Amino acid sequence: MNPTMRSVLRAYRMDWQMVSSQGWIWVPAAVLAVPVLVTAGAAAHMEALTGGVFGAAIYIYVLILMYPFMYEQQGHGGWMNGLMPVSRRHQVAGRYLLLLTSAGLLLVSCLLTWTGMAIVGAAGAGYFGGVAVALMWVYLIMVSLLCPLMYRFSIQKVGLWFMVVVLTLCFAVVGGLTAVAALVPETVLDRALSGVVALADNMMLIPILAVIGIATAALALAVSFRVSCRFYLAKEL
């Protein structure tokens, strides 16, 4: 193993020690919670709960990434980073490796959920693969935006801004959909929805959407890493 990778893994292990400082049992609990809840809801014909469960799941996996930042800012825990024989750039790389680990845990949870829905014969099992891919993309874009902010500002400010932005977007979406439903004739809405469904069923679009999704997620992570390095290198520990 080359020195660079050894240095990054040392920083990654330190971050993982922070995340698991209260115990490691929450890891399998977090991974299994979504499959159990969604599969149980599907078996009871309560598929409407799925959206709320996955919204909570994204929040949990965002907290995994936020926890090392909280640990560092409480009791001046960040001073240890100045003593660790790892360069700051490698410390950031270790933090992004933790980001990818949390994304991997979310992916495992999605795959288990898909399997559970298929076993109980849930109506949404056929298209859940696309939902899981979209969920992964949203998570990667979200943490790509949050990570540089957590290097630049306090975790309290980032958490507050995050909640404000999410609530604003939710109210905007609900208000927009309500306005569209009230102002646009029903026949026009039916034609538009039929067009969207036909577009979603077009198998030719799947490779194109996959390439766009992978490219945008990779670009977001690359830009996020560069910005995080710049903020952290300029930060006084």
What does each model-found stretch correspond to?
Residues G77-N81:
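Terminal targeting/leader modules
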Residues G82-R88:
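Short helix-to-coil transition segments within interhelical loops
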Residues H90-V92:
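Alpha-helix N-cap/helix-start motif at helix boundaries, enriched for small hydrophobics
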